[in-house]
Amino acid sequence: MPREKQKRGRRAEDKAKKDAAKRKRDEFPEESAVKRLKPSAETDTSNNEVTSGADYIPLEAEDGGNDVSMNDAPANDMPFYGLLDSEEQEYFSKANEVLELNQFHDAEERRLFVDSVYREADGKELKVACSQSCSRLMEKLISLSDMRQIRRLFNKFIGHFLHLVQHRFASHCCETLFINAAPGVTEKISKSKGRKAEVDEEDEPEPELSLAEMFMKVVEELEGNWGYLLTERFASHTIRVLLLVLAGEPVDLSSTDSVVASRKKERLGIVNTEASEENAVAERRKVPEVFEATLKKVMNDMVSGLDNTYLRALATHPVGNPVLQVLVFLELSHFGKASAKDPNSIIRRLIPDDDFGENAESSTFVRGLLYDPVGSRLLETIIKSMPGKLFKSLYKNIIRDRIGSLARNTTAGYVVLRTLERLGKDDLQDAMELIIPEIPGLIERSRLIVPKVLIERCLVRGVDTKPLSDALESAYDKNPARRLEQMLKLEPAASEEDSEEKQKQTGNNQTAAAEKLHGSLLAQTMLTASGPVSGLIYSSLLAQSAESLLRLAKDPTASRVLQQALTTPTSTSQFRRQFTTRFSGHLVELALDSSGSHVVDALWPATKDLFFVKERMAQELLKEELSLRDSFVGRAVWRNWSMDLYKRRRGEWASKAKGLDSIENGQGERPKSRIDLARAKFAAKAAEESSKAPVAAKT
């Protein structure tokens, strides 16, 4: 029988004693922690389920709820709604894929599928909303639901909103629910017989509360916790939507001016919704009268417990700043700008002084926001909505003399844009003179949004754009062809080896793509301005070679400039006569390209007064009919050019090409020829002379 392996000697004994002492020290903290409450068997089981399942991620551990002390914070006892089993997860994952593909034959088939998913999710709504993998499915379902389904789901969430809005995944479901329920707050509960029969079949009673009453229930649940939820990272975006719903303001996340979501907000759940539904979300709505009083109370409760110092600190808080933007926007736009005179109003607590003196408290606060990446967004909202008298004082004392240097800054430049939108003609003229010396530096650093907005505001206010045109011309290359390539960030044609190396170096470069986009937007804006500003782009387009034009037309970003040049009212018939013929011989190649096909579509209205050019282009397309019909984008070009009509009824196509068919249908007026214009001028002159003749006879 083998002996047990043992170590001999004093050193082995000493080492054994040290190991025993270490074990005692390791066990000591556990013995000293006996006072902590021992979890029950049920709690222990639930904790094991949470750690083992990756589907549910709680905000905080339930056991530590009594140890956390925060001002205005609710009891940190986040409930656990359970986990979906493997079969349920598999079903909901497949349902999510089906909705993502969106390959339904019609809206009715999609509605039946949504109904079946709701039946499967009955009783599991809270589990699905808190699930990491299935919460996105819940968002899609909500966006595709009718008001009856939204009311039922809303009713099941009531009583849990305080916890759901703080949950990492369920908070997004609450936000989507509020957005899609907003258009129905004025609807009354319908009690038709058809609805009762449908309820009996599904064995699910219709909620007794209307959507307006449900929103009031949400406010009651969250009451007393506004100060905490204001800076809670998951609840804050849901609170912003709730405030806008109570105010009846648009809650469309896709809008670029939306104060609801961040600029990187992902649009989930909006899968091919109807245009009428999107308009309902993006428009202002009538809301019940009780909403206005509730909104005022909620806004007051949010900031009443905060002193002025903490309120100003929220301006630079990454989570609290967007909520503060909504509060300021609603106070100034919804309750009237007269509310700014109230010393207890939010805008007055942020900016107590009207004069913005050198050492004034308001001046220090505003200057601190100018260069802050977070605070500058609040300043943008304030400038857009503040009363005119207060804005003039702010502009005169802080921004006017520094507008050139502010425009150079990456952060303060956005504040300058909001300022330019509010300036009158004289102030805009002075601001343009201060910004013009900075334009070469702005263009060199691709800060093109400042000259773009400056051109737009000059057109609105009627300011002469000649100095701006000279500055833009000097900032780019003197060669007209090279100028457009610089503006659109297009490198000259190179060999294949060089292009492959550049693709490897600049592959997936988002900065380069953004610069290219801003260059295209600047060129499109310049085309809308008549005179020398648009002339810079028109001369550059005419100077391009045929190869360069094809490269521009096939580029997704640059092709927009060609489309704008062909369709904008500032393009003259002389320019279009010279420019449209450049595409002859390449129409089929462009029509088969995803970007170039849009340029071919734009050639149809561009040749409205050039029938001989349009007919020649139609003949070129007809020769490659089979190639166009085999391509998706080619078929779109064939349809937009009415080529079937061109093949069968050439006379009707000619009338349509000249714009005569819209005249016959009463959709427009027939364009007058030169002889018609001369006749009308002669008739007007004769009528004027005949009216003067009796007057001369009387005298």
Swiss-Prot record:
Residues 1-10 have a biased composition (Basic residues). It comes from the Eukaryota. Pumilio repeats lie at residues 120-155, 156-191, 361-396, 397-433, 540-580, 582-619. It is found in: Nucleus, Nucleolus. One of its GO terms (biological process) is endonucleolytic cleavage to generate mature 5'-end of SSU-rRNA from (SSU-rRNA, 5.8S rRNA, LSU-rRNA). One of its GO terms (cellular component) is nucleolus. Keywords: Nucleus, Repeat, Ribosome biogenesis, rRNA processing. RNA-binding nucleolar protein required for pre-rRNA processing. Involved in production of 18S rRNA and assembly of small ribosomal subunit. PANTHER family: NUCLEOLAR PROTEIN 9. This is Nucleolar protein 9. It comes from Neosartorya fischeri (strain ATCC 1020 / DSM 3700 / CBS 544.65 / FGSC A1164 / JCM 1740 / NRRL 181 / WB 181). The gene is nop9.
